[in-house]
A protein has these predicted regions:
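A beta-strand edge to alpha-helix "cap/lid" segment located at domain peripheries
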Residues: 2-7, 53-125
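Structured beta->alpha junctions
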Residues: 16, 41, 72-74
Length: 125
C-alpha cells in the first residue's frame, strides 16, 4: 500500500473512529507490534502495542462525547503530517475539553503506524 494520501486518510479515519467509539483494541491495532506513540514532546514515547493499549484503555475510561477531525497537510512515504482537533468531556469532573494539534506519523507498507508524535494545545471549560 505504501503511505500516500489515501493510506494516511484511511489511518486517520480509523484513528478517529477508535477514539470516538472509545475502543482501545481498535486504536492499538493501528500500530505495528513495536510502534511508538509520543503524546507530547516532553514525555518519552510509549513503545509497543501493550503500552499503547494501556494508554487508550485509560482514555476510554475517562473521556466521553468525543468528536475528532483532521486536515492532511503532507502525506508521503517517509512522514505524514496532519492538523487534528478533538472535543470531549472528561468524565470526572465533567470538564468540556478541546484539543488542537499536529500529528507526525510514519506508516509501514500495510498502512500501520510505526511512529506517532503529537503536539497539541488544550482548552477546558
Amino acid at each position: 500500500m505504501g503511505n500516500n494520501g489515501a493510506a494516511f486518510k484511511a489511518w486517520l479515519d480509523a484513528y478517529g473512529q477508535a477514539w470516538e467509539n472509545r475502543n482501545p483494541e481498535a486504536a492499538t491495532a493501528l500500530f505495528i507490534e513495536n510502534g511508538t506513540y509520543q503524546v507530547t514532546p516532553f514525555l518519552e514515547p510509549m513503545c509497543g502495542r501493550k503500552a499503547i493499549f494501556e494508554y487508550w484503555s485509560e482514555v476510554a475510561r475517562t473521556e466521553e462525547n468525543i468528536q475528532f477531525g483532521y486536515e492532511i497537510l503532507v502525506a508521503n512515504a517517509e512522514l505524514s503530517i496532519a492538523r487534528w482537533s478533538a472535543s470531549f468531556v472528561i468524565v470526572l469532573p465533567g470538564l468540556q475539553t478541546q484539543l488542537d494539534g499536529i500529528f507526525l506519523i510514519s506508516l509501514d507498507d500495510a498502512g500501520r503506524c510505526k511512529s506517532l508524535q503529537e503536539w497539541w494545545h488544550k482548552q477546558e471549560k
